[in-house]
Amino acid sequence: PEECLLREVWEETGYTLTSYRYRGLVTFVSGNGVTEYMSLFTADGFVGEPIPCDEGELEWVDIEDVWNLNIWEGDKIFFRLMDEEEEFFSLKLVYDGHDKLVSAALNGKPMELFDILNPDGSKTGIVRERGVAHREGSLHATAHIWVVRKNHKSGYDVLLQKRSACKDSNPGCYDISSAGHV
């Protein structure tokens, strides 16, 4: 894949890569009978001058702005993994044949997917991976259970959990003891 990387970058941009890193292998299952395998690289060193590209217009985009572009939901997963400096990974993305993500697996283990909701609670039709949904602040269904017990002082104690430092949202804050995604 390295020869392809160097050739395609030069042909489509005019740049010769001087520093790159093999990040992962992505398997795309379209749902239309087509499966593609993509070797995923990042590059942070290059020389040369940009050239016009007949396959589309090249444009430098701030990494934070990528999340606001019209990209596939699965692409957001590997952008997140690269942003989090995930070691070399294998990511399998399965679509329903109509561009809707129906399953994702990281290194052979299923990833949690959510139906994204409108403010009224109805489904948008978008399915998003847990880490991406939390990063983007996407509305999704959860169930929260308050566990209580009677006491003699105020009537009730509530069981709380101090969220660990590794939680992806509100680390160190107190929360209910039992909650989960629907």
Model-derived features: where do they sit?
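Short, ordered coil/turn segments that flank beta-strands lining enzyme active or ligand-binding pockets
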Residues: 97, 119-120, 154
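Charged phosphate-binding loop/patch that engages nucleotide di/tri-phosphates or the phosphate backbone
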Residues: 84-111
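Short, solvent-exposed loop/turn elements at beta->coil junctions and helix N-caps
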Residues: 23-30, 130-134
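Hydrophobic "anchor" residues
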Residues: 101, 123, 157-158
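A glycine-rich, hydrophobic loop/mini-helix early in the fold
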Residues: 142, 147-178
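Unchanged
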Residues: 2-19, 26-82, 104-111, 167, ...
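Acidic, metal-coordinating catalytic segment for phosphate/diphosphate chemistry
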Residues: 110-150
